[in-house]
């Protein structure tokens, strides 16, 4: 269900009314206004002696032109037929978005295993609450979710999610698709609560309890 040019909700994970209503309570708009207020307080602290704190919004504003250039340069070829050079170029907006969202800060410990990065707060040795997936750029969300298409940026070997070092599981078969990777992550008892897939102009959010039902949220960056 496309609720706007920028948002697509899979299998009614979030109601259309919640996302589109102008109500300022118990709505998507209310959450946006609340978060904007929090970010403004950090970007422009009341104390004149306090230094501004960067936020995802301030980082996006400063990098917006660069991000637009990178997205405009993405290859228009089918995701499964991209050259190595095209895949490398496609990784640039992915890396920039991670920086904008704050995942490269010292607040987080990143465990990268191929196209899957497990994210946990520094000092937390439990299962990672978030996984970031690098995917090939796609034109539509439907292309991203084809079960057996080579949509990941590279093959992924499933890992032991209970171990903070995430060693590769012996005997596991390599995974090529975003859909299969998400299912592997979300059905593991030690899997992340959320996953964020970055695929060129699209960012897809999946949640552990709802992904098996085919529910997700996609944003056209």
Label the model's feature ranges:
Residues 1-221:
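Nucleic acid-processing catalytic cores of prokaryotic defense/repair systems
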């Amino acid at each position: 269900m496309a609720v706007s040019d920028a948002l697509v909700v899979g299998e009614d994970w979030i109601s259309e009314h919640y996302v589109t209503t102008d109500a300022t309570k118990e709505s998507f708009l209310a959450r946006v206004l609340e978060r904007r207020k929090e970010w403004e307080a950090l970007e422009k602290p009341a104390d004149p002696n306090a230094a501004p704190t960067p936020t995802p919004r301030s980082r996006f504003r400063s990098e917006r032109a660069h991000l637009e250039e990178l997205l405009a340069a993405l290859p228009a070829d089918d995701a499964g037929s991209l050259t190595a050079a095209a895949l490398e170029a496609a990784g640039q907006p992915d890396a920039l978005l991670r920086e904008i969202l704050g995942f490269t800060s010292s607040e987080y410990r990143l465990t990268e295993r191929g196209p899957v990065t497990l994210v946990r707060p520094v000092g937390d040795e439990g299962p990672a609450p978030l996984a970031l997936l690098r995917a090939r750029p796609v034109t539509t969300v439907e292309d991203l979710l084809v079960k057996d298409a080579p949509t990941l940026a590279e093959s992924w070997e499933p890992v032991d999610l209970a171990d903070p070092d995430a060693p590769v599981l012996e005997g596991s078969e390599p995974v090529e698709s975003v859909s299969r990777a998400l299912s592997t992550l979300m059905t593991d008892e030690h899997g992340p609560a959320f996953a964020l897939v970055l695929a060129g102009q699209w960012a897809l959010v999946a949640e552990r309890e709802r992904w098996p039902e085919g529910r997700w949220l996609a944003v056209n960056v």
